[in-house]
């Protein structure tokens, strides 16, 4: 508050009375002097003494003058100076018990709305003014009404001294207003006389000036809807005459609002934001999506309660109704579980947030208690595209907070698998708590759980502490981000003889010719062995020592599963690609040409009677994302003419690997489901898919095929081309590309260049021939620097690292 110096109204100075004679005359000894007229100043007779008095009091007077001057200056600079204020915006709602909602009040353009909103705004202003907040009042607005006892939605602005800004939180402001509503004051204000305001129903939220700007921009297309229980309410699309719209959604207080958004196009630039409030409050943002969101063509979003705001903003190139909106009110779901696990190591179940896969609610709190059968086991949580990491306690978790064994972890989205391993130290199990700390949420979280042996967490493999995954060890590929799986290796990507630790190449193991000193490479070739990096796992989960036993004409598994699904990998006839030669008809019967409107775009490979595999980056452009656009040709030789043996198919479904990242080309694989089955022939048949343990040896010669350009910058080839390339060690390739090569990639080519894939070959197959004569799919043409440049190899998607996803989609 201003501070002032209170000055006296008058100052009384001390005076000295001059003694008077009894007769009223002057000094008797001065008879000759005449008396001075009344009122005229008569100087004292002793003037020297008086001057000495002035001199004596001068320092005191100067000190007094200085003090007065200093006081005036302090008053001016400290008290008189205007205080710095900040505009604090609040948004909220209140219920009026003696008013009821009508359809007219739901339309902002109606006379009833304008009249009632003016009265309600006056009531709100009077309510604020009746508290100590009235000194700071700036402006207010009632912008909408809702169902039930009439609900008023409003905002108001207070100009608050800066030093008080933090003291007037929404909670404090609400308390002041509620106290006034509950008081017994005899005021004639309308909030006491005309409106019966429910104090318990008052909601105050923090807002900003920008929130009001966004709200005002939508008032030309403002739509209020009340959602009854059990009702699925379709919402009218945006008004294309405006640039933004707002859907104000409200339901019963004991239910949650759930919005479903489905994009109808793949190439729009519109933005849709959803808020956990009646208005577009940035601090209550749940999620925001842009550009038709190809990654999430359909999404369902939960509010924390009975209100939600959805705001649409037109893109640069807008289309009529680029999305469909619907809403319903749903009950709160319990998220408390107690589970007792069995003493086995396979996946035993899953935990998930309410209404998964819907976005979890901003009010989500889950508590899961899991009990293990003994302390021999630890608990593993398996996440998909979601991971946990430690976070400073003064920072909020934006994608969910996890509390596990007194450890605080924050969730975050990632395009990688992740496992959280929890060692058991107490027999009563572990409690896992998941909480949403802020309004911003994300897709529902689902986590699978299993047990692991604490003394041997990854039998035959390496436990990567960075992500909790079991990865192959000493196979020449750094699967763990810190590379520890490839350290201290005696025989990297080779077999180690037991007797003298000699290293021999894997193809020489179980080939009926002893290479180790005591023949250990030929032992246990007809019986089960512990599973490891290069052992083949049969369907009965037993493992065989022989490398690459699948489809070699010899049954190695006891259940014969290594020789199942072997109608693949055989060429129909015996007999671009930079540096390549023309192929013969039927030489590569799995080769596919992916076309749009008669134009070859990418290559691919047939892997089953209704499935073609290719590269995911072929579909990264919005204009190429719809499966309806594509036609797949099989048995084709020339692009400008049809052969008797070629057939064509439409694409019914398109699957991109969920971890595919456009910038890095990681997980660059896609599957196309054909509209009808393929009839195999001499010119059309599938290539063999490798097992996860299949070993493609560096230095091995393989082949790539396609209709791509025969030189960098050149036109695509009319005739199917083929070229042989050599598989390159992973560390050599990674070094050439400055360590941008992931474990899901492999390299092939030559140091001198010349032989390589090029533009138009993307998604085409890299195939390698096994001693059995069958061809296996080792890679898919993905990326590279130029075409056939020296010291830069071609980079391919490593099929063995994505085979689990492929099999999952196919089955």
UniProtKB/Swiss-Prot annotation:
This is Transmembrane protease serine 6. Residues 8-18 have a biased composition (Polar residues). Keywords: Cell membrane, Disulfide bond, Glycoprotein, Hydrolase, Membrane, Protease, Repeat, Serine protease, Signal-anchor, Transmembrane, Transmembrane helix, Zymogen. It is found in: Cell membrane. Disruption phenotype: Mice display the phenotype named mask, characterized by progressive loss of body (but not facial) hair, microcytic anemia and female infertility, all reversible by dietary iron supplementation. The mask phenotype results from reduced absorption of dietary iron caused by high levels of hepcidin. Glycans are attached at residues 138, 184, 216, 338, 433, 453, 518. Cytoplasmic domain mediates HAMP suppression via proximal promoter element(s). Residues 86-209 form the SEA domain. Its EC number is 3.4.21.-. The single-chain zymogen undergoes autoproteolytic processing. This results in TMPRSS6 shedding from the cell surface and conversion into an activated two-chains form which is released extracellularly. The process involves a trans-activation mechanism that requires TMPRSS6 oligomerization. Disulfide bonds join 335-366, 458-470, 464-480, 474-489, 491-503, 497-516, 510-525, 531-543, 538-557, 551-566, 602-618, 702-768, 733-747, 758-787. Residues 577-811 form the Peptidase S1 domain. Expressed at highest levels in adult mice liver, kidney and uterus. Also strongly expressed within the nasal cavity by olfactory epithelial cells. A weak, but detectable, signal in adult mice tissues analyzed including brain, lung, heart, kidney, spleen, muscle, intestine, thymus and pancreas. No signal in residual embryonic yolk sac, developing kidney tubules or in embryonic tissues analyzed including lung, heart, gastrointestinal tract and epithelium of the oral cavity. Interacts with HJV. Residues 1-59 are cytoplasmic. It is a single-pass type II membrane protein. The chain crosses the membrane at residues 60-80.
């Amino acid at each position: 508050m201003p501070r002032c110096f209170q000055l006296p109204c008058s100052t009384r100075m001390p005076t000295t009375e001059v003694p008077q004679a009894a007769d009223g005359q002057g000094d008797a000894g001065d008879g000759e002097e005449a008396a001075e007229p009344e009122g005229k100043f008569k100087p004292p007779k002793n003037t020297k003494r008086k001057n000495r008095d002035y001199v004596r009091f001068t320092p005191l007077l100067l000190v007094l003058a200085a003090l007065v001057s200093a006081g005036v200056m302090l008053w001016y600079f400290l008290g008189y100076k205007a205080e710095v204020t900040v505009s604090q915006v609040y948004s909220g709602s209140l219920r009026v018990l003696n008013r009821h909602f009508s359809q007219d009040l739901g339309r902002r353009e109606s006379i009833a709305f304008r009249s009632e909103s003016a009265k309600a705004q006056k009531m709100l202003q009077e309510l604020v003014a009746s508290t100590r907040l009235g000194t700071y009042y700036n402006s207010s607005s009632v912008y909408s009404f809702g169902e039930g006892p009439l609900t008023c939605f409003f905002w108001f602005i207070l100009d608050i001294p800066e030093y008080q800004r933090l003291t007037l939180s929404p909670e404090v402001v609400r308390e002041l207003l509620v106290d006034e509503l509950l008081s017994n004051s005899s005021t004639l204000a309308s909030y006491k006389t005309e409106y019966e305001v429910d104090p318990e129903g008052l909601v105050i939220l923090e807002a900003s000036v920008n929130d009001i700007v966004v709200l005002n921009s939508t008032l030309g297309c403002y739509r209020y809807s009340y959602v009854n229980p059990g009702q699925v309410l379709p919402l009218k699309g945006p008004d294309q005459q405006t640039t933004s719209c707002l859907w104000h959604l409200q339901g019963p207080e004991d239910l949650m609002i759930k919005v479903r958004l489905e994009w109808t196009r793949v190439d729009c630039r519109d933005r849709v934001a959803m808020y956990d409030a009646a208005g577009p409050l940035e601090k209550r943002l749940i999620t925001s999506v842009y550009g038709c969101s190809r990654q999430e063509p359909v999404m369902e979003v939960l509010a924390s309660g009975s209100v939600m705001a959805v705001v649409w903003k037109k893109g640069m190139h807008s289309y009529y109704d680029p999305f469909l909106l619907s809403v319903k009110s749903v009950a709160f779901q319990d998220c408390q579980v107690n589970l007792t696990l069995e003493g086995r190591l396979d996946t035993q179940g899953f935990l998930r947030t309410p209404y998964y896969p819907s976005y979890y609610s901003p009010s989500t709190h889950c508590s899961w208690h899991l009990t293990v059968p003994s302390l021999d086991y630890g608990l593993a949580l398996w996440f998909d595209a979601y991971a946990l990491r430690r976070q400073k306690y003064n920072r909020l978790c934006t994608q969910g907070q996890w509390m596990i064994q007194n450890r605080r972890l924050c969730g975050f989205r990632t395009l990688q698998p992740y496992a959280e391993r929890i060692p058991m130290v107490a027999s009563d199990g572990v409690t896992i708590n998941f909480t949403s700390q802020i309004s911003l949420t994300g897709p529902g979280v689902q986590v699978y759980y299993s047990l692991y042996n604490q003394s041997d967490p990854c039998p035959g493999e390496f436990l990567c502490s960075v992500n909790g995954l079991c990865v192959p060890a000493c196979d020449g590929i750094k699967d763990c981000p810190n590379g520890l799986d490839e350290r201290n290796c005696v025989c990297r990507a080779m077999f180690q003889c037991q007797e003298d630790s000699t290293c021999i190449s894997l193809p020489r193991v179980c080939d009926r010719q002893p290479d180790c000193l005591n023949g250990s490479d030929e032992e246990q070739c007809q019986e089960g062995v512990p599973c490891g990096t290069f052992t083949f796992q049969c369907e009965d989960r037993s493992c065989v020592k022989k490398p690459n036993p699948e489809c070699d004409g010899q049954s190695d598994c006891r259940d014969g599963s290594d020789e199942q699904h072997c109608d693949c990998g055989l060429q129909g006839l015996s007999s671009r690609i930079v540096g390549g030669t023309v192929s013969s008809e039927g030489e590569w019967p799995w080769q596919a040409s992916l076309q749009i409107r008669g134009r070859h775009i990418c290559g691919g490979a047939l892997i089953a009677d209704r499935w073609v595999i290719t590269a995911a980056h072929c579909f990264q452009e919005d204009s190429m994302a719809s499966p309806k656009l594509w036609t797949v040709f099989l048995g084709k030789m020339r692009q400008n003419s049809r052969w008797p043996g070629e057939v064509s198919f439409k694409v019914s479904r398109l699957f991109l690997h969920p971890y595919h990242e456009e910038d890095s080309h990681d997980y660059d694989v896609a599957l196309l489901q054909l509209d009808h089955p393929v009839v195999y022939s001499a010119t059309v048949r599938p290539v063999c898919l490798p097992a996860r343990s299949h070993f493609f040896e560096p230095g091995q010669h393989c082949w790539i095929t396609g209709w791509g350009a025969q030189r960098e910058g050149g036109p695509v080839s009319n005739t199917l081309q083929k070229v042989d390339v050599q598989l390159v060690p992973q560390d050599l390739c990674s070094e050439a590309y400055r360590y941008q090569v992931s474990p899901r990639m492999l390299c092939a080519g030559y140091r001198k260049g010349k032989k390589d894939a090029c533009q138009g070959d993307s998604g085409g197959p890299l195939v390698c021939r096994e001693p059995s004569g069958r061809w296996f799919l080792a890679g898919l043409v993905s990326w590279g620097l130029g075409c056939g440049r020296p010291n830069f190899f071609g980079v391919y998607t490593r099929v063995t690292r994505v085979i689990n996803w492929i099999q999952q989609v196919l089955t």
